[in-house]
Amino acid sequence: MSGSSFGSIFKIATWGESHGKGIGVVVDGCPAGLTLNEEMIQTFLNRRKPGQTKYSTPRKEDDLVTILSGVFEGKTTGTPISMMIANETARSADYSEIASFYRPGHADYTFDAKYGFRDYRGGGRSSGRETIGRVAAGAIAAALLKELGIEVFTYTKSIGPIQIDYHKCQKENLTLSPLCMPDLEASQKAEDYLEQCIHNLDSSGGMIECIISGVPAGIGEPVFDKLDAQLAKAIFSIGAVKGFEIGSGFEVAKQLGSENNDGFAFDANGKLIKLTNHSGGILGGISDGSEIIFRAAIKPTPSIKKEQQTVNKSGENINVSIKGRHDPIIVPRAVVVVEAMAALTLADLLLSGMSSKMDYVKKIYQK
């Protein structure tokens, strides 16, 4: 299977299946000397692991990371960093029935169409557990970005019809909400909405917003490797994502040029600033120094107990109700996955951008 790697300089390759012995990732291209330990990575993994709230799958996994290589005495060595997380509570028997039919909304049919074979146990490689490797790698990228004063903040913007405004939220409330929704009043309304979904044997989708601050102007490559194009690729590679927009996004189709253009000015300290941020912090595929803001639309969990129509391998039309342990909503656990992919994208482009000016090269190599 191709397509399991991401990045050009700061590169990752994930491996493993939902019900295999473990999930892992290899990170290549991380500079030597970055402070790193398993606890730092575990903090990220704990944000996505299952079974922590009533709104995530009851499958209990500790998701404990083991660093196998690339770190010595708390510092990265510059060699590939290999990490593994064991699958400890897989219940493959829950999935034996689905070997004979295609689950609506899943990749069962398309994997069969491409490979003529599929691992039906929890979706195999197409399972959401694949994102564990991304999150572990993203923790390393986030540590690198932190050294440069760059912060990636990601949260649940909406669940079903319940939507919040970032500017009216308090970041510290993020960990107080089981849904990663920093507006606690809205979070409670979203919980009530999810209770209705569960009662109706259904699931819900939602939206995740990411705000990246501290990115200097000049990051990203024009034409095919634009910063916004790379972010879109990264976020769309997450299985549950079905939509992506940056800045004002699809609203720009309704705006006039005079409304959409972001004016420039100098602040009291003589620093160039933008008066608005409809562009989402990117112009011409290159960061402009303001906050990078994007949103990802997450589809409802496809595994639901409500009866749905499908077909089996005997050529029959059938009705199915999906059994097993599944999230009524993917969004809260996907928040850190989106954050990880954003961090990986920025880390890769920052490192590749070091050769864009002769001044940068001289700072490193001139004697």
From Swiss-Prot:
Query: What do the Gene Ontology cellular component annotations say?
Result: cytosol
Keyword field: Amino-acid biosynthesis, Aromatic amino acid biosynthesis, FAD, Flavoprotein, FMN, Lyase, NADP
Residue positions annotated to bind NADP(+) are: R48
Q: Name one GO molecular function term.
A: chorismate synthase activity
Indicate the secretion signal residues: none
**Gene3D superfamilies on file:** Chorismate synthase AroC
Task: Fetch the NCBIfam families from UniProt.
Answer: aroC, PRK05382.1
Give the record's subunit note.
Homotetramer.
State what protein this is by name.
Chorismate synthase
Q: Which organism is it from?
A: Lachnoclostridium phytofermentans (strain ATCC 700394 / DSM 18823 / ISDg)
Read off the lineage from the record. Bacteria, Bacillati, Bacillota, Clostridia, Lachnospirales
